[in-house]
From Swiss-Prot:
Residues 570-624 form the F-box domain. This is F-box only protein 40. The lineage of its organism: Eukaryota, Metazoa, Chordata, Craniata, Vertebrata. SUPFAM superfamilies: F-box domain, TRAF domain-like. It is found in: Cytoplasm. It comes from Homo sapiens.
Length: 709
């Protein structure tokens, strides 16, 4: 017999399974209810008790945006949600375009020096973008990482492999009280010495000493240990009991002898001695890996199979506590409680054969092995001067060269490398900087803030390829601009595809004699339909469109002020009604709205009315700490702003500029060199009387006839 099915709360027995729009069943309590239509006129008809369910499906129901948790304040009909996501202010995309820009330490710097002598121009796009990338590069190069010898003596080097000293472990979470740290734990090198049983118990009872991150690894070890030890409990219980009884009798007789002698000793030393004897007895009878003689007791108590299983599960602990030798000669190879992933390093595994005899010297001189030889290192000391007397190294060029060497070659300068099994190359490089010591947080930008600016990177950039390791590269730059989802395709096409990738020779054309130092540059393209030019703003760190103002409008700026009610000068633009100002602001692009909002309070309020339609919202997160020591990230506030997108440009038009040949006629670097002195040709350098070789003369030289043997 089946169980009776109950209707959902609020539903009637008939209404639960009725889907007829023309249902005419009479209304009865607890059975059926009236059939109604949706009050939003979506066309649905249903029983009145299903109205709450219909609100979850009605396409005309007002619901918040799907990105309401990310800051979107708009509400709309349910059927408009998908279309709204394309223009949602909370649907933000970060541009991940990357490019490489290398330093110019090996190239000619005449052009870079001449460019920096001139006044910086917004129209020189490659120079402005290179200067911006140079600022980012200088803020990312840490001096201590490139030159570890220049670290300040007061600072300690960071611990390797994530190990921290005892002094650094203090805190609310995961900290260890210094008073509870056993004597076997060194605070300097972080190595764990062998602990006594009393120190283990104190450390185990201390809640602050627990390493919760490695709890799973500890639990796995102890579970295997318990499983292996459980096999030996039954066989070793009798033997351990007999030994304990005999040792207790010896301890009690010893105490009676001491009391009978009547020596003037206190009770506290006797109790300490008793506890020490008990611990000694436990150390010699237990089967734990840290107890003495555990392997000898296991050999007699269990069979070979259980003994080998115990070694497999407790091998690391037995090696650490000195019960068995390690498989490698390195001491302290396995540290209990520090089960960290070891970094895989490539080593040279070449072994010299027994019959190998190195005779590299005979490759050049057979008698070199007979000559006396001596070991001598080539170093800066061979110059006969001290390091202080050496000329100061260029800080910027030296830093960029060392960073470039590690990036392109894969290793630092002066790295030792093994040639074969017998020889190794050693190299040293001495640098003498003006500041002799650097702190751990010092970057190259901090040291070059007071020096005059210069251009130390290439003007042209390169695309990132698969051969280049961009994860740890200091010369890989990222756009990292935020845009709304509908703005991102326009940004990528206009900025990265049309402008940035075509700066070297197409969108922007430099003089052919630029390698000699000529700074002349031409921009070939402009937006269609208007007189404007493309610029790069250092303040906004992005490209923008700057319209060309007519001369008559520039002259009328002086008379562009009116007198207000208080006799003060009032700008004619601010005197317009708010509706007209908002209408005018609607024609501006996002980057122009961002600049207009910083003009005055009135313009800021006008631009604020366009934020939901043209702007985007970002969440600022803040880390919150609780009283128990835990942390979490919470939304601190919402930030509304405009993106850096300029006007949409589908196609470009050619600028009305003169030909580059016209510039070459007056280029100061285009110097014509007239050759007046005669120059000998190649054929004139040889002797004039020379036998002419021909095919006939070649055959005449050959002897005729046959040789008879």
């Amino acid at each position: 017999m089946g169980k009776a099915r109950r209707s959902p709360p609020g539903h009637h027995r008939h209404c639960e399974g009725c889907f007829n729009r023309h249902c005419h069943i009479p209304v009865e309590p607890n059975t059926s209810c009236l059939v109604i239509s949706c009050h939003l006129l979506c066309g649905a008809t249903f029983h009145m008790c299903k109205e709450a369910e219909h609100q979850l499906l009605c396409p005309l129901e007002q619901v918040p945006c799907l990105n309401s948790e990310y800051g979107c304040p708009l509400s709309m009909s349910r059927h408009k949600l998908a279309k709204h996501l394309q223009v949602c202010p909370a649907s933000v995309v970060c541009c991940s375009m990357e490019w490489n820009r290398w330093p110019n330490v090996d190239s000619e710097t005449t052009l870079h020096e001449n460019i920096m002598k001139e006044t910086p121009s917004e129209e020189c796009l490659d120079t402005a973008l290179a200067l911006q990338d140079q600022k980012v590069l200088f803020r990312s190069l840490k001096m201590v990482e490139l030159f570890p010898e220049t670290r300040e003596a007061t600072e300690e080097e960071p611990t390797m492999n994530g190990e921290t000293s005892v002094e650094e472990m203090g805190g609310a979470v995961g900290g260890v009280d210094i008073g509870l740290v056993p004597h076997g734990l060194s605070a300097t090198n972080g190595e764990m010495a062998e602990l006594s049983q009393e120190e283990r118990e104190v450390l185990a009872k201390t809640k602050e000493g627990m390493d919760l991150v490695k709890f799973g690894q500890w639990e796995n070890i102890f579970s295997k240990e318990h499983a292996a030890s459980a096999l030996t409990n039954s066989s070793a219980s009798c033997e351990s009991k007999n030994k304990n009884d005999s040792e207790k009798e010896q301890i009690s007789s010893g105490h009676n002898m001491v009391e009978g002698e009547g020596a003037p000793k206190k009770k506290e030393p006797q109790e300490n001695q008793k506890q020490q004897d008990v611990r000694t007895a436990m150390e010699t009878t237990g089967l734990a890996p840290w107890q003495d003689g555990v392997l000898e007791r296991l050999k007699t108590a269990v069979d070979a199979k259980d003994y080998n299983m115990y070694l497999v599960h407790n091998g690391r602990m037995l090696i650490h506590f000195g019960q068995m030798p390690a498989c490698t000669p390195k001491e302290r190879d396995f540290v209990y409680g520090k089960l960290e992933a070891q970094e895989v390093k490539t080593v040279y595994t070449f072994k010299v054969p027994v019959s190998y005899c190195g005779k590299r010297a005979r490759l050049g001189d057979a008698m070199l092995s007979c000559k006396p030889s001596e070991h001598k290192a080539v170093d800066t000391s061979d110059l006969g001067i001290t390091v202080e007397d050496l000329p100061k190294s260029d800080l910027i060029k030296t830093t960029l060269q060392c960073a470039l060497e590690r990036e392109l070659k894969g290793h630092v300068i002066s790295e030792s490398r093994s040639i074969d099994g017998l020889f190794m190359d050693f190299a040293t490089q001495t640098y003498n900087f003006e500041p002799e010591q650097f702190s751990s947080g010092t970057v190259l930008a901090d040291l070059t803030a007071a020096t005059p600016g210069g251009l130390h990177v290439e003007l042209h950039s390169e695309c990132v390829t698969r051969r280049h390791n961009k994860s740890s590269s200091a010369f890989t730059f990222t756009c990292n601009k935020f845009f709304r989802r509908d703005e991102f395709p326009l940004h990528f096409k206009n900025v990265h595809t049309d402008i940035q990738s075509c700066l070297n020779g197409w969108f922007q054309h430099r003089c052919p004699l630029a390698y000699l130092g000529c700074t002349f540059v031409q921009n070939h393209f402009r937006p269609p339909g208007q007189k404007a030019k493309v610029i790069y703003s250092q303040e906004l760190k992005t490209f923008a469109i700057k319209p060309e103002v007519a001369p008559e409008l520039s002259e009328g700026r002086k008379n562009n002020h009116l007198l207000g009610h208080g006799g003060k000068s009032q700008n004619s633009l601010t005197s317009l009604p708010l509706e007209i100002l908002k209408y005018i602001a609607g024609f501006l692009d996002s980057v122009s709205l961002a600049q207009l909002s910083q003009v005055s309070v009135l313009m800021r309020n006008i631009c604020a009315t366009l934020l939901q339609e043209r702007g985007m919202v970002l969440l600022q997160w803040k880390k919150k700490r609780y009283s128990h020591g835990g942390t979490s990230w919470r939304v601190h506030r919402e930030i509304w702003q405009f993106s850096s997108l300029f006007s949409k440009i589908k196609s470009w038009e050619f600028n009305e500029v003169t030909s580059m040949s016209e510039h070459l006629k007056s280029c100061p670097f285009n110097i014509v060199e007239h050759k007046t002195d005669p120059i000998l040709l190649t054929s004139m350098c040889q002797p004039r009387e020379q036998a002419r070789e021909s095919l006939v003369s070649t055959f005449r030289i050959r002897p005729r006839g046959r040789y008879v043997s």
